[in-house]
Amino acid sequence: MRRALILGSLIALLAAPAMAQGNNAINVFGVVDKIDASTVVVKNDDGGAVETFKIAPNVLYIQQAAAKLSDIKSNDFVASEAVRKEDGKLHSTELRIFSEKMRGIGEGQRPMNDAKNQTMTNATVTGTAITNGSNVMKVKFPGGESDLILDPDPNIPVFKFTDTTASAVTAGAKVRVQGVRNAEGATVNRITVMP
């Protein structure tokens, strides 16, 4: 269930602006079979197919880890899935704290694909407050700002993404690889090591 949630939601969240969209985009969850300086071989979680990807020279290595609401601070660049409830306000259902290198990725607020009353917001935290027992996170993005309600629910997942190096990507590691397919083959420019 957790993997399905992450798979469904992070596609829009982490897609790089320069990355090709549609059928040419690579977004694969799997386990590393082997890796060297120029390629990474991944066994896909979806069906178990094994595929070799070229590693782009400017590849970004990311480590994903569990975090807490208290880890979020002013000026952090974050992403929030949220649902608009009966009170008309956006209540976060999942939060992610990005590294500085990821600042600006997917920035803005938009409806989630085929999800009724759900939105994805990638924005900079400008402050927090407490209203009716819930934290309210204020965020700003180009062309707008928003209040996100952080209900006191321990089941709301929070993740932190930090920069790492190729040394974190070893055989047996759970990863998410992103990139693009073209006439020259499949190349990844982002490798995220999953918990």
Regions inferred by a protein language model and the residue ranges of each:
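Short, flexible, surface-exposed loop segments at domain boundaries
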Residues: R2-L5, L10-A12, P17-P195
